[in-house]
Amino acid sequence: QEAIIQRLLALTQRWQAAGLPVTGVEIDHDAATARLPDYQRFLQRLRQRLPTALQLGITALPAWIGSPNLPGVLQQADSSVLQVHAVLSPQQGLFDGPLALHWVRQYAAVTPKPFRVALPAYGMALLGFDAQGAQVESESSLRVAGNGRELTVAPQQIADFLQMLAQQTPPRLRGIIWF
């Protein structure tokens, strides 16, 4: 973990020295729920070492919502992004609007900080299953021959979700991010 922090600090310093206005860092780590205490300690150490002018953001998973360790993780960050896509089994698809809305409401009740919701802006192919589980092709080809099933989200599903969200915007929700 120390090596990660050192590398991150070196990168932000290099970018700033090159004239780039670095305003924050976002950590996208899909920690297992049982590992949230370790993740909290990492974020706490990172927060202590980051310049105070830099914001610290994290991504969060719906699986964390029921964990008693989630508030401690959220306390370390200035903001978060709740990822409500591609968190179910590939057979269930990329996105479930009513379930995502449920997660957003639960998350809003737990987080004391501003947050955004991550929605899918991509598709993927479900190529099949083997002993290791699902073979999913997303950002790079697996070069597997055979038939696959494309997983996408219909624009109307997203529109319906956004309409439901707009009817009762949870506190601290600051917007949507497309992943």
Model-derived regions, located:
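A structural motif corresponding to the C-terminal end of an alpha-helix
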Residues: 14-21, 49-50, 76, 106-115, ...
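Aromatic side chains
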Residues: 39-42, 85, 179
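Substrate-binding surface in catalytic domains of secreted glycosidases
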Residues: 44-134
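Chitinase-like catalytic core of GlcNAc-active glycosidases
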Residues: 1-76
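Well-ordered, non-membrane alpha-helical segments in soluble/globular domains
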Residues: 2-10, 40-45, 94-104, 152-163
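Substrate-binding cleft of secreted/luminal carbohydrate-active enzymes
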Residues: 122, 127-179
